Amino acid sequence: MGSKVSRTQRCAVDVSPLSVAEEKTSCGILVLLVRHVDLRSRALVTFTRGVYSHASLGFEDDPETYYSFAYRGFRIEQADFLVRRTPDAWCRVYRIPCSAEQERRARSIVSSFCGRKESLKYNAIGLVLACLHIPLARRNRFYCSQFVALVLNRACGIGSKRWARACLPDGLSSVRPSELLFDGLAQNLPKAFSSGAKLWKLSPTI
């Protein structure tokens, strides 16, 4: 399943390359894509003809913590919980290189979401319209990949506002440049985190 490519993946989202100075001190934003096996997730990937049903955002200095939206709103996710809950879920982890300033902006955005967690809701209507390629931004309402794309757009200038508002999980695998750090079952994620090792030092890149 890891080798499947959806229609969304065929069109990469171009990102301006980092300058030489930025490359030397580049940081990284992590994007975790998951194909859950519950009924809702199966319906979503069937309707979108995609591979993944959920997306989260993290940072390379803490590859076990991610931020996203689910049916109950904004949430902070731990990789070990994913492993315990759905060990057979297929996952991919991408690293998107960025400058220190871009990472700082991304952290600031995520921090602002954490600070108003109780007022944030799930954007179910936005997700349905995104499946029809219709972008919809709603105040304090987001779905998982819309949130991730919004952070990447605002912090790093990736894609456009329209792209971010209608981005589905598979669309995040098309962001370039990026490194594929992990591609496999959730139950194998702990091996990548063992002994405090950096995930991207243990996996191939693209």
Regions inferred by a protein language model and the residue ranges of each:
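Donor-binding and catalytic core of enzymes assembling or modifying cell-surface/extracellular glycoconjugates
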Residues: 10-54, 177-178, 182-206
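Glycine-rich catalytic cores of cysteine/serine-nucleophile enzymes that process amide/ester linkages
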Residues: 33-97, 127-136
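A structural motif
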Residues: 100-127
